[in-house]
Amino acid sequence: MAAKIISAHELECLSAEGSVKIFDCRFALNDPDAGRAAYEGSHIPGAVYVDLEKDLSGPVTSGTGRHPLPDFAVWRETLLSLQINANSTVVLYDGGPGVFAARFWWMLGWAGIPDVMLLDGGFEEWRRQGLPLGTEEHSMDRGAVSGDTVSQVESAGYVNVDYLVTRLSASDPLVVDAREPERFSGRKEPLDKKAGCIPGAVNRHFALNLSKGKFKAPESLREEFMRLLDARSPETVVHSCGSGVTACHNLFAMELAGLSGSRLYPGSWSEWITDPERPIEVHEG
C-alpha cells in the first residue's frame, strides 16, 4: 500500500490541470459537526467533504468500536458516489496532522485505489502558504464512472479481534498503539469506557511522525520505527488506537519509511473493551 505525500504548491499545480479529485476530511472526535462547519467556512477550491462517521465508518453496535469499517459493498457504493475508481488521482487533507486523511487513505487502499496522496501539513499548511480558498460546496453527482473498477483487495492488511485474542500469548503480532501516552497507560481516558491498553502493546503516539506539522523525512521515520520494532519484521506489526483512525497515521508513516506490510486493527481499543473477558493492561506511574 503506497504512501505518498504532496506539498501545497504541488497540489495547486496539479489542481490547475483538472485531473485530481480532492477530499476534505476534517473532523473532531469531540465535536462531530465541526469538520463540516470548517469546510463550509473555507476549503481548498474544488474539494468535496467526506465525513468520518457518515462516510468512512459503518454502523456502531454493542460489539464494535466507535468507528468500525463499513461493509465493503457499502463502501464500494460510497466510492462510486464520489466518482472514485482505480484510475483516479486522489488527494486527501484534514486540519493538519493527517489522521482523518490517513483513515481515508487506508480505506482507498482496501478498495484497490493506488494513486492517493496526503497533503503534507493539511489545510493549515495550504492556508499558511496563502493559497486560494473556496467557500462553494462541491459534491460528486452519482453516475456512470469511466473505468469503474473498485474491488476489495484481499491482501489489504487488517486483522480482527479474534485474531489478536488467539495471538496474544505468543506476543505475535506486535501491537503498536497510536494514542497519546496518557491514554495508552490508562492514566486518563476521555473517550472510551475503560482505560488502559491491549496487553503487550507498545506505544507510539502518531504525533511523533510529524515535525512542525509535516511528516518527518522517510529516513528519520525509518530509524525511529526500526528502534520500536527491535529487529521484528514490519509484517508482524498491527496498528491500533482508540477506534481505528490515528492507527492509520502510524501505518502510513511506516509505509512512507519503506517499512511495508504492517496491518490495521480497525476496531482498536474501543472494540477490545466491549467484551469484559478480554484482558487489559494498565501502566502505573
Describe each PLM feature range.
Residues 1-285:
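Cytosolic catalytic domains that perform sulfur/thiol-centered chemistry
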